[in-house]
């Protein structure tokens, strides 16, 4: 099988970003103790990262859109590396939060520009699969990077987890340098024209679907460690094992979502959002024993990431005149859902409803996303392809 080196380089970058984004979720109790805050307060570090992605996605994309894509992507990974180093040496909670925000500024633009690059190096009928290949690095991070970072945090200290992740940033920069063509600087974007594209009702509807889909995921995933500790009475070793299993589910779902979205974006969204809603409603009952927890985490992981490629392609297709900006803003929308999901889960916990209600809240959000897809499906084109420019 011929290796597509640009896609491989993008997947390596996605692996690093996935590790730094998701590893704190398995380390919330450890980080909370380390900076002397509550678990819900530590959860706000995840929300802060998500807010940084929202701000950084359009800002960094517009600032770098006239640069050669290789240079832009390497610069974004340099920000990633610096942010993780600063997180590792942060002396207190507020400094750690600011460091996480800095780290997050690369996220949306990397995946946004990366999605356009991925779609441009394959035939049009394989664009969703190409985007899924890049996101495979994100899912593989949950199999290897996140559990390894969790283990480092539990055994050596959470600071070492961030430092090791910074090392991934260096590897990513090297791989991007040698794998992507140098290219030349592009024309400066027509900001008003591209922003006008984003204001279209069908684009806004697609972005809102992304917010709700991601919100459903992060309502539970942000607090996955204490949820498993509460419902399953899980040990740290079992939590780590479940993170690996969730990562396997992510990878399977990402692959299936990309393949099926090549056939039907809306159909793929409907099917997997329904599955996501059902499995989250079942988790409080299934996860009462370790076998049920393992089954539910694997299915939940698959359903969660199966919606990612179609969500990304949906926005890129309805905003094909501004593929880079729309793709980046969609990543920002994903992380707005991240922030809202973390806040929703934290609100459930703070209200005293118990950790068992956290996945139920996630199911409610998934139901809203599914409803929106049904309402807007007739207006969403299935045949528009992403511009390769």
Curated annotation (Swiss-Prot):
Coiled coil: none annotated. It comes from the Bacteria. Its main location: membrane. The keyword Glycoprotein does not apply. One of its GO terms (cellular component) is plasma membrane. The chain crosses the membrane at residues 7-27, 44-64, 71-91, 101-121, 131-151, 160-180, 204-224, 237-257, 267-287, 291-311, 331-351, 357-377. It is a multi-pass membrane protein. GO terms for molecular function: transmembrane transporter activity. Belongs to the major facilitator superfamily. This is Inner membrane transport protein YdhP. It comes from Escherichia coli O157:H7. The gene is ydhP.
């Amino acid at each position: 099988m011929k290796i597509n080196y640009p896609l491989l380089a993008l997947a390596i970058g996605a692996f690093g970003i996935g590790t730094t984004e998701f590893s704190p979720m398995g380390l919330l109790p450890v980080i909370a103790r380390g900076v002397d805050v509550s678990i819900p307060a530590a959860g706000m570090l995840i929300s802060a990262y998500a807010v940084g992605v929202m701000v950084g996605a359009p800002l960094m994309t517009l600032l770098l859109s006239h640069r050669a894509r290789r240079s832009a992507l390497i610069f974004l990974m340099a920000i990633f590396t610096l942010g993780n180093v600063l997180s590792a040496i942060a002396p207190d909670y507020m400094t750690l939060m600011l460091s996480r925000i800095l780290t997050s500024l690369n996220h949306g633009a990397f995946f946004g520009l990366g999605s356009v690059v991925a779609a441009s190096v394959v035939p049009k009928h394989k664009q969703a699969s190409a985007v899924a290949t890049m996101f495979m690095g994100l899912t593989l991070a949950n199999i290897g990077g996140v559990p390894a970072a969790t283990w480092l945090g539990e055994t050596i200290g959470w600071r070492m987890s961030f430092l090791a992740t910074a090392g991934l940033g260096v590897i990513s920069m090297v791989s991007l340098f040698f794998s992507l063509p140098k290219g030349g600087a592009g024309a400066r974007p027509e900001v008003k024209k591209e922003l006008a594209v984003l204001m279209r009702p069908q684009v806004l509807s697609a972005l809102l679907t992304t917010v709700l889909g991601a919100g459903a995921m992060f309502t539970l995933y942000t607090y996955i460690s204490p949820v498993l500790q509460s419902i399953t009475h899980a040990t740290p070793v079992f939590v780590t094992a479940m993170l690996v299993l969730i990562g396997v589910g992510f990878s399977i779902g990402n692959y299936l979502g990309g393949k099926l979205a090549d056939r039907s974006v809306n159909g793929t969204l409907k099917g997997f959002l329904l599955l996501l809603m059902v499995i989250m409603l079942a988790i409080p009952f299934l996860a009462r024993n370790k076998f049920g927890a393992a089954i539910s985490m694997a299915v939940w992981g698959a359903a969660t990431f199966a919606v990612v490629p179609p969500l990304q392609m949906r926005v890129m297709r309805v905003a094909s005149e501004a593929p880079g900006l729309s793709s980046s803003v969609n990543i920002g929308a994903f992380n707005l859902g991240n922030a809202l999901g973390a806040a929703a889960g934290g609100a459930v916990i703070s209200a005293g409803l118990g950790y068992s209600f956290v996945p139920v809240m996630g199911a409610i959000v998934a139901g809203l996303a599914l409803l929106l897809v049904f309402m807007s499906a007739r207006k969403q084109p299935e045949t528009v392809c992403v511009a390769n420019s």
